Structures are given as structure tokens and as C-alpha cells.
Design a protein with these regions (language model features):
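Conserved positions in beta-strands of structured domains
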Residues: 2-5, 133
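Flavin-dependent oxidoreductases
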Residues: 4-94, 98-109, 118, 124-127, ...
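Active-site catalytic microenvironments for nucleophilic, acid-base chemistry
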Residues: 36, 40, 183-187, 278-282
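Short, surface-exposed acidic
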Residues: 45-46, 127-131, 192, 285-292
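C-terminal catalytic lobe of FAD-dependent flavoproteins
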Residues: 78, 87-88, 99-227, 234-247, ...
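Iron-sulfur (Fe-S) cluster-binding segments and ferredoxin-like electron-carrier domains
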Residues: 104, 235-246, 269-287
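Short Fe-S-cluster ligation motifs
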Residues: 256-272, 289-309
């Protein structure tokens, strides 16, 4: 998105790289960019600082090292480095908390890794760091007043901020969504749709079935018998479901987030080619168009020899 401006028709005019949208309401949930969009329409300025948090993810063999989340004492920048078992059996350690200037600054650093190792061992001993399978970083949107900003902007009717969402933002997300929906309903004077379905069917997990049920599933749909991701035992059937459901996956990370394909010990080293073939076939696109997580993260950047990819 490039700009947001008031529309002569009322509402807002949003210009993107590809097109222009006219809308009566904008919900500004742009994370570390929320201040930039807010400041395009309001005289009361908002400032957000990207706060980087780095993590380690350990192999599933380490998940039982602790039985519950272990926190250190909270500090100025958050709750400190924690050690927690995940619901899928891994061990997650982090985050750090470092203010940065770059709104895309999700690179990991040697300094961050050393900080995680040092601080985590204050609360948990003998952490098997040799079992780390990946490290990553994310950015929290720190608002100067250290507050969640969830409201219709006073001098920009119809522009709704959901900004400055730090910890416990994940826990708060369902309530934030309901509050934002209520504000939108009031602005547009909407009436409840009695036919609206509030729930959606999740992606079938064959691992939760009995052997008899799994065999019957594979008999009806052989795609569930073709394992694509061996680390997490994710089948082609699950990947197809993730692609073809409403708001389905269109990227490699989209599939990973919905199915865990690529989240295991080899970090997609084995299953990437097959997953790309499935995306190519199902979305009817070329493999050169497939991205890891949107524009600028293309999986294939060129050819190293003649012939088909």
C-alpha cells in the first residue's frame, strides 16, 4: 500500500502498487507500519518503534525438558527470555527485546543468539542447544505510551486503529477482533446476518484418527496416503485442503502455517520441491511465481542450467 487519503465521495481512497480502492471504513492493523497509515489521515500523530525479538526453536526430542513455560523477571522491555514447550512437542526459547529502526528488520544476530543462551540458563539448566533446528526474529509494534490503541480516530471518522499491539497481543487478539468488529458495525450501522456461519472446519489431521479411520480416509482419498513432509508426517491431502479452503494458502509459508509442512527438523529441506510442484499444479502458476511469503521472496530466482525447472 502506498497512500491513504480522504475521498471526495466520503470515506477513504487507498492507493496500492496495482490498483486504487474506495472504502467507507479502514481498519488499520498494519503492525509496525500502523503509525505511518494513521499519520496520513490524522493530525494527532502516532509513533511506533519496531522492537525485535529473536528466538530459538529446538527439535521435538527436547520438548519434555520443561513441563510448562518458565519466565524470568519482567524488565523494561518485556517479560524477558522464556523457555516453553510447544503444543507440538518442540522447545521454544526467547525472545530478546531490541529497539530497531528498520520496519523489516527481522534478521537474526550473533548478539541476540548469545543473549538467548545466556539468559535462558538463568532459569533452566542444561538446555540442549545442540538441538536447535532454526532461529528467527519478529517485530513487536511498541507504541510510545506503551498502550494498545484500539479506537476510531477522532479526527478521521471511519478510520479504526488497532495499533501498538505488543504482549499480550496474541492472548488479546480474539477480544480485539470483536471490539474492532463492533466499532465497524456502529460506523456503518450494520445489522446482524442470521445466516452468517461463525465457525469453519479445520484442516483434517490424520494423526488424530485411529488406524482404521486413517485407512478408510486413504481408501477414499489416496492423497492422504502420500507423505510430503516426512519430519512432521504431513500428507498431500492436508496440503491440498490448505490450498483449496476459503482464504487458502498461496505461498510456501501459507502452507507451513496451516499444516506444519516444512516446520520439522530439516526445515523444508526435503519437502520444498514437492510442495512447490503441488502449488504449481493447483494454482496453475509457474514455479518462478511461487514465493516463500509474498512479493520479494521468490523461491526461484534463475536457472543454473538449461532445461525445465
Amino acid at each position: 500500500m502506498k497512500t491513504i487519503e480522504r475521498s471526495v465521495k466520503g470515506g477513504y481512497r487507498i492507493s496500492t502498487q496495482d490498483t486504487v480502492y474506495e472504502t467507507k471504513v479502514v481498519v488499520n492493523a498494519a503492525g509496525v507500519y500502523a503509525d505511518e497509515f494513521h499519520n496520513m489521515v490524522s493530525e494527532k500523530k502516532l509513533h511506533i518503534t519496531p522492537r525485535k525479538g529473536e528466538y530459538f526453536l529446538l527439535d521435538k526430542t527436547t520438548g519434555a525438558h520443561v513441563s510448562h513455560t518458565v519466565f524470568t523477571l519482567p524488565g523494561k522491555y518485556g517479560k524477558g527470555v522464556l523457555v516453553t514447550p510447544t503444543v507440538h512437542g518442540n522447545l521454544l526459547i526467547g525472545p530478546t527485546a531490541t529497539d530497531v529502526e528498520q520496519k523489516e528488520g527481522t534478521d537474526t544476530t550473533m548478539q541476540g543468539m548469545e543473549e538467548i543462551c545466556k539468559k535462558a540458563q538463568h532459569s533452566v539448566k542444561e538446555i540442549p542447544f545442540r538441538q536447535v533446528i532454526t532461529g528467527f526474529a519478529g517485530l513487536r509494534a511498541h507504541e510510545d505510551g506503551h498502550e494498545f490503541v484500539i479506537q476510531e480516530v477522532e479526527d478521521a471518522p471511519g478510520f479504526i486503529d488497532c495499533a501498538g499491539i505488543e504482549s499480550p497481543g496474541l492472548t488479546s487478539a480474539p477480544a480485539i477482533g470483536r471490539l474492532a468488529a463492533e466499532i465497524v458495525r456502529n460506523v456503518l450501522e450494520l445489522k446482524e446476518n442470521p445466516a452468517f456461519c461463525k465457525t469453519r472446519k479445520g484442516i483434517l489431521n490424520p494423526a488424530e484418527l485411529t488406524a482404521k479411520e486413517r485407512n478408510e480416509l486413504i481408501r477414499k482419498n489416496p492423497a492422504y496416503g502420500r507423505i510430503v513432509c516426512r519430519c512432521e508426517m504431513i500428507s498431500e491431502g492436508e496440503i491440498l485442503d490448505s490450498i483449496h479452503r476459503p482464504l487458502g494458502a498461496t505461498t510456501m509459508d501459507g502452507i507451513k502455517r496451516r499444516t506444519r509442512a516444512g516446520m520439522g527438523r530439516c526445515q523444508a529441506g526435503f519437502c520444498t520441491p514437492k510442495t512447490m510442484e503441488i502449488l504449481e499444479r493447483e494454482l496453475k502458476i509457474r514455479q518462478e511465481e511461487i514465493t516463500k511469503n509474498g512479493a520479494g521472496s521468490e523461491m526461484i530466482v534463475g536457472r543454473n542450467k538449461d532445461g525445465k525447472i
